[in-house]
Amino acid sequence: MKNIKKNSLINSFIFSKICVGSSMAYTDPTNFNVLLGYRKSLFALINPFSFQSSLKTCFIFLESFVKNKYDFIFIVDIKDSILFDKFYHVCKKKQYTLLKGSEMSTGFLTNKKILNTVIITIFLNHKKTELIQKEALLMNVPLISFSDLTSNKFSSSFYITGNYNSFLSQNLILTLLSICFEQKHEHS
């Protein structure tokens, strides 16, 4: 039997473009169509093509809102202080609202000007996402969610499922969002 080194195993995951998500026990049934396979108690394999497609579609969707000068309300659960500060400065520069998920409560949209507004939830748990979805539906505000497999994919206007537990995956999403908002658009 051939002995496999740890680095070669890590490289095989990276180069095979497999996205590893939560175990099947924590997966909402609405996300089964994006799974390639699973190990009952360990992890699920997310189809990388569906993930890349939903990510690309999301940023095209976001660009249209940016071009039309919509306001954004970000509700985040970013544990790393460096990533939070970095994203906070991007939001502050663009005058977008940034709220922590821990600060959310029922009725948070009632006192806000919501005309031409989009809510984006980033890395929230499914309970917070569902609370925000109810508010967004009542106020008729589009909701975009970056969340894991535990959330119902129909809980948002646009849902991007993935494994956002690591620093690198969170950094990637926040960097892509920052780039999307920093681009110069022909119509602006």
Which residue ranges define each predicted feature?
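Ribosome large-subunit tunnel/peptidyl-transferase-proximal elements
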Residues: 2-163, 167-188
